[in-house]
Regions:
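Short, well-structured segments within or immediately adjacent to enzyme catalytic domains
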Residues: 1-159
Length: 159
């Protein structure tokens, strides 16, 4: 979606990340922004168009990301996943907040909600320390239709 408009892959690396960050892998340049998996084309072929999105100002395009991994702690994640996948990947690198790019083009900082699960990849205390979680419209409910609101193309009635 954005590739043809970028001059280099450096646009996918947060300038604030350094070798001290747990997910930096000894300072190797890896993507630090993840694309909303729902928009990636892996689920829908071809990838959805912006015309298919009901509320572009309430749909995440990309956000700062890392993924938990039992062996290395964190690793670069090219995607952020809806909360119902139980794989929190939004990373609050900036005073606990993550930069979020919305489909309509606006950007803001959001504090990821710490997941109370992570498929066993990382305990909640470590997630909180690393500011790793999901972007939610409200508190976790356990209901995918509610929790996945910002990640979905079609919004539930009563949004």
């Amino acid at each position: 979606m954005l590739g043809p408009y970028l001059k280099s892959d450096a646009a996918w690396i947060c300038p604030s990340v350094n070798a001290d960050w747990p997910g930096s892998h000894a300072g190797l340049p890896e993507p630090t922004y993840g694309l909303n998996f729902t928009l990636s084309g892996y689920l829908l072929h071809p990838a959805p168009t912006t015309a298919q999105v009901e509320a572009s100002s309430e749909t995440i395009l990309a956000a700062e990301s890392e993924q938990p991994n039992m062996n290395v702690g964190l690793f670069a994640s090219p995607f952020i996943f809806p909360p119902s996948v139980h794989q929190p990947a939004v990373c609050g690198r900036h005073f606990g907040q993550a930069n979020v790019l919305w489909l309509d083009g606006h950007i803001n900082a959001r504090r990821p909600a710490t997941a109370f699960w992570s498929k066993g990849f990382m305990d909640v205390a470590t997630q909180e320390r690393l500011h790793l979680g999901d972007i939610l419209k409200g508190p976790y409910t356990g209901n995918a239709q509610t929790d996945d609101y910002y990640y979905e193309l079609v919004k539930p009635a009563g949004g």
